[in-house]
Swiss-Prot record:
This is Imidazole glycerol phosphate synthase subunit HisH. It comes from Leifsonia xyli subsp. xyli (strain CTCB07). Keywords: Amino-acid biosynthesis, Cytoplasm, Glutamine amidotransferase, Histidine biosynthesis, Hydrolase, Lyase. It is found in: Cytoplasm. Pathway: Amino-acid biosynthesis; L-histidine biosynthesis; L-histidine from 5-phospho-alpha-D-ribose 1-diphosphate: step 5/9. IGPS catalyzes the conversion of PRFAR and glutamine to IGP, AICAR and glutamate. The HisH subunit catalyzes the hydrolysis of glutamine to glutamate and ammonia as part of the synthesis of IGP and AICAR. The resulting ammonia molecule is channeled to the active site of HisF. The active site is at C82, H190, E192. Coiled coil: none annotated. Heterodimer of HisH and HisF.
């Protein structure tokens, strides 16, 4: 049976490709900003494109920060995509301006240290051997479009959850490509634009709900 998944519609970018990919991966998908529906779904997907500060502002205006916090407190899965991953960190720095994120993870999102920015294209991802998301797609490449990333990871095991599984990619220097941390997972790349590998990754997440 399909698992009910909400893609949170809060005004950040084109979410329809995420909806279609999640449906193709086996989810029963609803696109909504309704707080009750977002809270009750088996899984919540938080996409995001554009500037860190603008995404944070839109999320908060739609009470997305409260929804995410309540879901995580109850152990209910959340998946962030691209800037939807970035805003889970404590802060983001763009054009010299620092903006507070949602603070689910310590650390900062900063400009990529690369000669060519933005980073647009397909990259390999170095995932831990016990990753659930990357099961079956260890050697695949995923599609990235970004100029900023978290380039350090400091969080270890917290509370009842095991040590986070952190995956890495490289563009100029290493950066965090994906995180699996209890009920909160996220990808810097776009699984919905990553072909069959992205669909398998989404199916792995759906299967874990």
């Amino acid at each position: 049976m399909s698992r009910p998944v909400v893609v949170f519609e809060y005004g950040s970018g084109n979410v329809h490709s995420a909806v279609k990919a999640l449906e193709a991966a086996g989810a029963d998908v609803e696109l909504t900003r309704d707080r009750r529906r977002a809270q009750e779904a088996d899984g919540l997907v938080v996409p995001g494109v554009g500037a860190f500060a603008a995404v944070v502002d839109r999320l908060r205006a739609a009470h997305g920060d409260e929804i995410i916090e309540r879901r995580l407190a109850g152990g209910r899965p959340v998946l962030g995509i691209c800037v939807g991953m970035q805003v889970m960190f404590e802060r983001g720095t763009e054009h010299g301006q620092e903006t507070a994120g949602l603070g689910e993870w310590p650390g900062a999102v900063e400009p990529l240290c690369a000669g060519v920015v933005p980073h647009v294209g397909w990259n390999a991802v170095e995932a831990p051997a016990d990753s659930v998301l990357f099961d079956g797609v260890w050697d695949e490449r995923f599609y990235f479009v970004h100029s900023y990333a978290a380039q350090h990871w400091t969080l270890e095991a917290t509370g009842p959850f095991p040590k986070p599984r952190v995956s890495w990619a490289e563009h100029g220097s290493r950066f965090v490509a994906a995180v699996e941390n209890g009920p909160l997972s996220a990808t810097q790349f776009h699984p919905e634009k990553s072909g069959s590998a992205g669909l398998r990754l989404l199916a792995n997440w759906i299967g874990s709900l």
